[in-house]
Every structure is written in structure tokens, then in C-alpha cells.
Amino acid sequence: DEAETRTSCLVPANDADRKALDRRKPAEVICPRPGLYARRAKWELLKRHPDIRALMVVRGLATQHPDWVFAHVSAALAHGLQVSGRSLGKIHLATNQTAHTESSGQIVRHCVPDEELAECVRVGGVRVTSLLWTAFDCMRSLPADEALVVADSLLRKTGRTAWWLVRTIKDAYCGWRGIGRALAVARFADGRSENGGESMTRAAIIRQGLEVPVL
């Protein structure tokens, strides 16, 4: 119940707890990832909310691995940004520029500059890259429609404007790979978009060269 209240998967405190949970599988309990548990009834209720499921996994992993710093869409979820369901299949972690650990399986590692790693924050018990870096990292690498979902939700969360986002990205990340893509998304960002579906529809309209609707 405590884990569910925190929107997290449960991490057993000891081997005895783990064995007790395993005995309740699969009727009552499921394992979204090794070592992480959730009540089947709760998990099934969230079938149409993959973002909440993904956030539960991220928070569970943060309990398992308190030294991990989450990045990209995993960090976006922790920050409360909206993310397209198409982006939620993997776990994204930050690594420094000298580390030689590679992505593998369901883990994607993102090289993050040391100055940004120094700015990592803890949100809801999860260590994550900063809000601005997280949004920029998503905007420069995701498909344009999914990137706009993140950009719109950032402006919705902060109450800022597209002009502010363009100016801030130029000032903070000039010269960074992918800045052109991020700026192209930022110019069309609008915090008045109510949800990800609306953002993706607007992205399709922009891509077709049609007049962008006034929100």
C-alpha cells in the first residue's frame, strides 16, 4: 500500500519478503521487472496509463539502485512531464563522458556533461537530470511529434512561453549536438495544449504545412 501511495513498484526489504511475494504470483502479484512487484489488480487498472506504469518502475528502480541518475524520458516522467506512450519501452540512465558502460537490453545510457550531472536533483525519491536538460535531451532526440509532447508539457508546467524556451535553449546549450532539432520543436511549443494527444495532432498539422490552430 505504501509503494502504491508513492506510485512506485514495491521493492522487498529482505529475502523473506521476496519469497512471500513470489508465493502470491501470478494470481495476486506481478513482476514488471526483476525484483520489482505490483499488485496485479492495480497494474491491470493502469493498462490504459502506460506512463503511470513506467513511473512506478522508475521509482522502484530508484529504490533498488539509489546511486542511479535517470535521464531522458525516464527523468521526464519523474519531473511530471508528459511523454508519448511510444517512448516508454526502456529505462534511460545518465552516465558521464568518461564512463565506458554501454546500453544493454532495456537500459539506455545517455552521456551527460559533468556540469549537468552536478545539477541533478531528487524528485519523488528519484535522482534525475535537471528539468531543463531533461526536456532539451528529449526534444533533440525524439521524433518531432513526441518531442512536442515534452516541450508543451514543460511550458504547461512552468507557465513559460515558446519564446522563453527558444532563448533558454540557445543560451544554455549553444553548440550541442541536436540543438537545431530542439529549437525547431521549441518554436512551436505551446503550454496551452491540454494533453499529449493534442500536441501530437498539432505536430501532424505543422508537418503538413497547414495553419496551426490557435489554442
Residue ranges of model-derived segments:
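A short acidic/basic microdomain associated with nuclease active sites
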Residues: 203, 209-215
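Short gly/ser-rich loop at a beta-strand->alpha-helix junction or flexible surface loop bordering the NTP-binding
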Residues: 1-178, 214
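Helix-loop-beta segment of a Rossmann-like dinucleotide-binding subdomain
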Residues: 178-185
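Hydrophobic alpha-helical segments and helix-packing faces
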Residues: 158, 175-178, 193-199, 206
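A short, highly charged nucleic-acid-interacting micro-segment common to nuclease
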Residues: 62-65, 185-200
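Residue-level signal for short amphipathic helical patches enriched in basic/charged
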Residues: 142, 192, 208
